[in-house]
């Protein structure tokens, strides 16, 4: 039986990063909404509990989310983060006030008290000998009086109680966010909590996950047939391989050509899955169906819903041909769930995801989502462990709605054709340009292997079609044609991302090729927005 950490979600948009950091330490963790019952908490079998941040204020009184009382009575270690710290303080007899100075962004925190959690963890030491941590803050309220039994663990000039600890009861809390990459020692702090404070062993790994997931799929599905929408992207590909490992020929993959695929996508998918892996794949041409329903629709949410709805309809028609088809499998992963504020979330919806937001209540198939609790990097590791080709697994992610969310405004076949060719040029140039580190660029992958080229060095790169025209000059003539934006980001978990610092020469080559080779485009721009504030996809 694995050790496991229970994470209670109070609505932070980065709650799942806590789970990611715990898993990085080799310990299994799951996220549940804060309002689970005391009975659930008592029966879960947690080795420790982490309370996430959230958008609410404990000062709101009875209206504010509260920690289940059983959490404080279990006798296992508890760590509160941001709102989790404030809720812990208020419920255990401390006081919280609305801070006069709000703290959002980088901060330097002084450690106090030589606690078991922070002992020997620091980024630098002041001339006075104080250990300091470089952290990320995001709060307005703050604790102004600690509960009985707690001592000061960390402080900043604007937040005198930035961390507190009750070592006897093994309760700890921070006002800053150790789960985000901006907190330099965050990973070490969480590892210390789960290993040293909670006593967990590093006993959660991908081979074990595969064995457990395969068994779970078999129990869930039984002798039923499963159909899966195969896009050729990383998530659906790994989901297909995992499900095929579990139930073999009970899985049928449905590859839908909706006219919004990348260049030569259909050919590649059929060769890879049907011929190389022996998976049952049905190729359906539904271009007219999708384009017809998308005509005149420009709202991003409406487009996503339509594309999701039409996918489901295609699957239902296909399922009707199979008497035993009872399940619709999807490659939904954790970031999809988080941004849709789906099941288990108390956060605010950012945008609907094709995998989790477009399914009507009339769906006649049950959902099978074997990757729902995994981050993107974990999905890739799973794919490699399942024996999928490295280049397939480490291919950049592609959204379920395809180019439909990369064409701003109304989707037209003409726009899709232009974008497909521009995107292919961008990817080709990234692949053939050797990687040389530039300021702000990561020099190696997560496993320490140096990047071969700029495609490897970026986590996701693509072109976006802008439905606006600009004036240009080609030869001796005036042009009035469309604009394409290039987007490339670097990230570990797709929850936050930095724009990729691509070499100017590379960008110049891409721009020249697109303008010269794609008739109908005369201007190329580069997106230098991070996430947040922007999302990775434009729609």
UniProtKB/Swiss-Prot annotation:
Keywords: ATP-binding, Glutamine amidotransferase, GMP biosynthesis, Ligase, Nucleotide-binding, Purine biosynthesis. Residues 4-203 form the Glutamine amidotransferase type-1 domain. Its EC number is 6.3.5.2. One of its GO terms (cellular component) is cytosol. It catalyses: XMP + L-glutamine + ATP + H2O = GMP + L-glutamate + AMP + diphosphate + 2 H(+). GO terms for molecular function: ATP binding; GMP synthase activity. Coiled coil: none annotated. Residues 204-395 form the GMPS ATP-PPase domain. PROSITE patterns: GATASE_TYPE_1 (PS51273), GMPS_ATP_PPASE (PS51553). InterPro entries: Class_I_gatase-like, GATASE, GMP_synth_C, GMP_synth_GATase, GMP_synthase, GMPS_ATP_PPase_dom, NAD/GMP_synthase, Rossmann-like_a/b/a_fold. HAMAP family: GMP_synthase. Catalyzes the synthesis of GMP from XMP. This is GMP synthase [glutamine-hydrolyzing]. It comes from Janthinobacterium sp. (strain Marseille). The lineage of its organism: Bacteria, Pseudomonadati, Pseudomonadota, Betaproteobacteria, Burkholderiales.
């Amino acid at each position: 039986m694995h050790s496991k950490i229970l994470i209670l979600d109070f609505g932070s948009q980065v709650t799942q990063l806590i789970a990611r950091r715990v898993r990085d330490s080799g310990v299994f963790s799951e996220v549940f909404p804060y309002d689970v019952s005391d009975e659930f908490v008592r029966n879960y079998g947690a080795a420790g509990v982490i309370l996430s941040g959230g958008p609410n204020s404990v000062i709101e009184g009875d209206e504010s989310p509260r920690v289940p009382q059983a959490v404080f009575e279990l006798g296992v270690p508890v760590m509160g983060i941001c709102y989790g710290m404030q809720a812990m303080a208020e419920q255990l007899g401390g006081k919280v006030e609305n801070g006069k100075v709000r703290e959002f962004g980088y901060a330097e925190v002084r450690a106090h008290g030589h606690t078991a959690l922070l002992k020997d963890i620091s980024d630098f030491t002041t001339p006075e000998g104080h250990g300091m941590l470089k952290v990320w803050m995001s709060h307005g309220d703050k604790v102004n009086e600690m509960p009985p039994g707690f001592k000061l663990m960390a402080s900043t000039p604007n937040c005198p109680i930035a961390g507190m600890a009750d070592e006897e009861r093994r309760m700890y809390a921070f006002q800053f966010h150790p789960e985000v990459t901006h907190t330099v020692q965050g990973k070490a702090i969480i590892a210390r909590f789960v290993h040293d404070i909670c006593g967990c062993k590093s006993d959660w790994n991908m081979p074990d996950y595969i064995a457990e997931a395969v068994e779970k799929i078999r129990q869930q599905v039984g002798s039923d047939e499963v159909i899966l929408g195969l896009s050729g992207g990383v998530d659906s590909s790994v989901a297909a391989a995992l499900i095929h490992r579990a139930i073999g020929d009970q899985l049928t993959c449905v590859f839908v050509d909706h006219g919004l695929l990348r260049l030569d996508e259909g050919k590649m998918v059929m060769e890879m899955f049907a011929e190389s892996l022996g998976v049952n794949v049905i190729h359906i041409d539904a271009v007219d169906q999708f384009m017809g329903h998308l005509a005149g629709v420009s709202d991003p949410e409406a487009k996503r819903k339509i594309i999701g709805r039409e996918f489901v309809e295609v699957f239902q028609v296909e399922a009707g041909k199979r008497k035993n088809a009872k399940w619709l499998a999807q490659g939904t992963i954790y970031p999809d769930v988080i941004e849709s504020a789906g099941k288990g979330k108390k956060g605010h919806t950012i945008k609907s995801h094709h995998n989790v937001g477009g399914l009507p209540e009339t769906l006649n198939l049950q959902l099978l989502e074997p990757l729902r609790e995994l981050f993107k990097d974990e999905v890739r590791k799973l794919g490699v462990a399942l024996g999928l080709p490295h280049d397939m697994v480490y291919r950049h992610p592609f959204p379920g709605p395809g180019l439909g969310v990369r064409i701003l405004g109304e989707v037209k076949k003409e726009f899709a054709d232009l974008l497909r060719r521009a995107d292919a040029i961008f990817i080709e140039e990234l692949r053939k340009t050797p990687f040389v580190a530039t300021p702000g660029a990561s020099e190696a992958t997560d496993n320490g292997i140096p990047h071969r080229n700029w495609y490897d060095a970026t986590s996701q790169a693509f072109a976006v079609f802008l439905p606006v025209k600009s004036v240009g000059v080609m030869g001796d003539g005036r042009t009035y044609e469309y604009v394409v934006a290039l987007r490339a980001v670097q990230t570990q978990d797709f929850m936050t991302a930095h724009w990729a610092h691509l070499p100017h020469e590379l960008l110049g080559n891409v721009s020249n090729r697109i303008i010269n080779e794609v008739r109908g485009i005369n201007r190329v721009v580069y997106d230098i927005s991070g996430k947040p504030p922007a999302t990775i996809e434009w729609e």
